[in-house]
């Protein structure tokens, strides 16, 4: 009975560690999706303003360049090589 209790405790710890890792990955991916949506909205605003007025908005371009300069959220996720 003692070894069964130890095995149960060890398995609970392993499951907890796996859950933390999975939810961390989910959070990172969710943040990347939100960031990409923000960039897409800025592109749309710049396109609309360029079509309406003939020139692009400086504030939107600065905001977009600031987002793009933030770099990658995770150093192991480099797809632009």
Swiss-Prot record:
Q: Tell me, what's a Pfam family for it?
A: Vpu
Q: Which HAMAP family match?
A: HIV_VPU
Biological function: Enhances virion budding by targeting host CD4 and Tetherin/BST2 to proteasome degradation. Degradation of CD4 prevents any unwanted premature interactions between viral Env and its host receptor CD4 in the endoplasmic reticulum. Degradation of antiretroviral protein Tetherin/BST2 is important for virion budding, as BST2 tethers new viral particles to the host cell membrane. Mechanistically, Vpu bridges either CD4 or BST2 to BTRC, a substrate recognition subunit of the Skp1/Cullin/F-box protein E3 ubiquitin ligase, induces their ubiquitination and subsequent proteasomal degradation.
Kindly provide the name given to this protein in its UniProt entry.
Protein Vpu
GO MF entries? CD4 receptor binding; monoatomic cation channel activity
Q: Name one GO biological process term.
A: symbiont-mediated suppression of host type I interferon-mediated signaling pathway
Query: This protein's superkingdom?
Result: Viruses
State how it assembles.
Homopentamer. Interacts with host CD4 and BRTC; these interactions induce proteasomal degradation of CD4. Interacts with host BST2; this interaction leads to the degradation of host BST2. Interacts with host FBXW11. Interacts with host AP1M1; this interaction plays a role in the mistrafficking and subsequent degradation of host BST2. Interacts with host RANBP2; this interaction allows Vpu to down-regulate host BLM sumoylation.
What kind of membrane protein is this, topologically? Single-pass type I membrane protein
Q: Which UniProt keywords are given for this protein, alphabetically ordered?
A: AIDS, Apoptosis, Host membrane, Host-virus interaction, Inhibition of host innate immune response by virus, Inhibition of host tetherin by virus, Ion channel, Ion transport, Membrane, Phosphoprotein, Transmembrane, Transmembrane helix, Transport, Viral immunoevasion
Classification from the root reads: Viruses, Riboviria, Pararnavirae, Artverviricota, Revtraviricetes
Q: Which family does it belong to?
A: Belongs to the HIV-1 VPU protein family.
Give me the disulphide-bonded residues.
none
What GO cellular component term, any one, is given? Answer: membrane
Coiled coil segments of this chain? none
């Amino acid at each position: 009975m003692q070894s069964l209790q130890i095995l149960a405790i060890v398995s609970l710890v392993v499951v907890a560690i796996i859950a933390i890792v999975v939810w961390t990955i989910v959070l990172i991916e969710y943040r990347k999706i939100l960031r990409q949506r923000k960039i897409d909205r800025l592109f749309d605003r710049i396109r609309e303003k360029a079509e309406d007025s003939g020139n692009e908005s400086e504030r939107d371009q600065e905001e977009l360049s600031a987002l793009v300069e933030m770099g990658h959220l995770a150093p192991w996720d480099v797809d632009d090589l």
